[in-house]
Amino acid sequence: MATGKTVKDVSPHDFVKAYASHLKRSGKIELPLWTDIVKTGRLKELAPYDPDWYYIRAASMARKIYLRGGLGVGAFRRIYGGSKRNGSRPPHFCKSSGGIARHILQQLETMSIVELDTKGGRRITSSGQRDLDQVAGRIAAES
């Protein structure tokens, strides 16, 4: 008896790639004007090269909320942060941009994929969980 596949059953890389293309095709996420010039954090020296980086980040954030829940802007700043290169001085950890995380979370809320959690952060909605599981099922069927 075959059961439905969830996000936990498929490769994270394959899922994020497939869900990002799903978000791009659906047209519900509107790209802000600044996506081609903004850096993703203080630690970065250049803006992302991939023109679809915004969709990939949104898909990754939706997956993380699906798996853990209760994540807010501060948590995503820490997750997507990294080591800032200081030239000849030692590197140090820096958080990523909070504006990008906030904007993506607001977009996911308008699409009713995530909602505010009473305990803080965001959690996945039932329609959002169904949407993510459908994409995971398509990935599992292809492989």
From Swiss-Prot:
Biological process terms in GO annotation: translation
Keywords carried by this UniProt record: Ribonucleoprotein, Ribosomal protein
GO CC list: cytosolic small ribosomal subunit; nucleolus; plasmodesma
SUPFAM superfamilies with a match to the protein in the record: Winged helix' DNA-binding domain (SSF46785)
Entry-linked Gene3D superfamilies: Winged helix-like DNA-binding domain superfamily/Winged helix DNA-binding domain
SMART domains associated with the record: Ribosomal_S19e
A Pfam entry, by short name: Ribosomal_S19e
GO molecular function, one term: structural constituent of ribosome
Family per similarity comment: Belongs to the eukaryotic ribosomal protein eS19 family.
Protein name: Small ribosomal subunit protein eS19y
Species whose genome carries this gene: Arabidopsis thaliana (Mouse-ear cress)
